[in-house]
Amino acid sequence: MSEIIIREITESTSDDINIKNERFKKFGKMIPSYQNGKWDYTVSENEGESWDCFPDENYSFEKMAKDHVFLGACDGSVCVGLAILRHQWHKYLYLYDLKVNSAYRGQHIATDLISESFKYALANGYRGLWTIAQDNNLAACLSYINNGFRIGGFDTEVYNGTSLEGSADIYFYKDV
């Protein structure tokens, strides 16, 4: 296994922000609950196996650089993981996108990207990070929990009237 280096993506390496999305296994759903001012969750596992893949974005470094920061996980000169952070008016930096090339999954690269994102947030006056994951992307949801995020909200309406109807968004926060 080669050493993966996390670095900020700059204009000279801006092509790295368009690494391809790759398929991921959908094996269950996170079900949040809110009682007495506290969030909790249960997990419902799927019967059978299914896969999904988000459409590729066509990010423009030039258009996004003003209010976004890009961190790349690099194996030599090849970007194999990406975290995109968006500046916010409130005290949480938004983890806008997080992805790792499928051949590199299981090597804690997402954890390293989250860790560097959190350091960046703190160094820039934020009190932490926030992000969103679909409830049926259980691997992502559990990864956020395992990386110190907590549930802070749940949107059951966002996908109504779309091909994703029945899915919901879970809001995750990681505090100082």
List each model region and its residues.
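DNA-contacting interfaces and partner/effector-binding or oligomerization modules
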Residues: 2-6, 11-12
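C-terminal "cap" of GNAT-fold acetyltransferases
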Residues: 3, 134-136, 147-150, 157-176
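Acetyl-CoA-dependent GNAT
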Residues: 11-12, 19-92, 96, 101-102, ...
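Short secondary-structure boundary/hinge segments and terminal tails
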Residues: 35, 95, 122, 139, ...
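Short loop/turn motifs at secondary-structure junctions
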Residues: 79, 94, 125-127, 148
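Conserved acetyl-CoA-binding loop-helix of GNAT-fold acetyltransferases
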Residues: 100, 106-119, 145-146
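Conserved short alpha-helix immediately C-terminal to the canonical SAM/SAH-binding motif I
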Residues: 113, 137-140
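Conserved GNAT acetyl-CoA-binding A-motif
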Residues: 121-133
